[in-house]
Amino acid sequence: MTLTVRVISPDKTVWDAEADEVILPSTTGQLGILSGHAPLLTALDTGVLRVRTSKSQNWQAIALLGGFAEVEEDEVTILVNGGERGDTINLEEARTAYSQAQTKLNQVPAGDRQAQIQANQAFKRARARFQAAGGLA
């Protein structure tokens, strides 16, 4: 048995294919989904979705910018604020953005809560893109 996996962002369908396994970046940690999984609705954090396809048995990475996932009857529907397949991300650009976001996060003044939140979100986005592109394990 396989899963039907759809990743949908406001402006495009990021992924629509069969898969053997999915690993979701939920707000409470990584969540593995296999065929026959119990029905589930969960919030997703900014991070990397990993999909193991039936055809190649290779893992495909997709950077997600938060959203929700629903699992029901071997169908995984993922609605995200933004998503980008790892194989479409330029690794060097992602590496540069990750490094810059990390530097900015480290330079935020300790008392500026709003700046800390914004820098942390930018860092999480940059890290997800860099990981999906293959830059971080």
Curated annotation (Swiss-Prot):
Cell location: Cellular thylakoid membrane
Any one GO molecular function term: ATP binding
Record carries keyword Translocase: no
Domain of life: Bacteria
Membrane topology: Peripheral membrane protein
UniProt main location, coarse: membrane
InterPro entries, per the entry: ATP_synth_F1_dsu/esu, ATP_synth_F1_dsu/esu_N, ATP_synth_F1_esu_C, ATPsynth_dsu/esu_N
Keyword field: ATP synthesis, CF(1), Hydrogen ion transport, Ion transport, Membrane, Thylakoid, Transport
Cellular component, GO, one term: plasma membrane-derived thylakoid membrane
Signal peptide: none
Pfam families: ATP-synt_DE, ATP-synt_DE_N
Similarity section: Belongs to the ATPase epsilon chain family.
Subunit structure: F-type ATPases have 2 components, CF(1) - the catalytic core - and CF(0) - the membrane proton channel. CF(1) has five subunits: alpha(3), beta(3), gamma(1), delta(1), epsilon(1). CF(0) has three main subunits: a, b and c.
Entry-linked PANTHER family: ATP SYNTHASE DELTA/EPSILON CHAIN, ATP SYNTHASE EPSILON CHAIN, CHLOROPLASTIC
Described function: Produces ATP from ADP in the presence of a proton gradient across the membrane.
Cross-referenced HAMAP family: ATP_synth_epsil_bac (MF_00530)
Protein name (Swiss-Prot/TrEMBL): ATP synthase epsilon chain
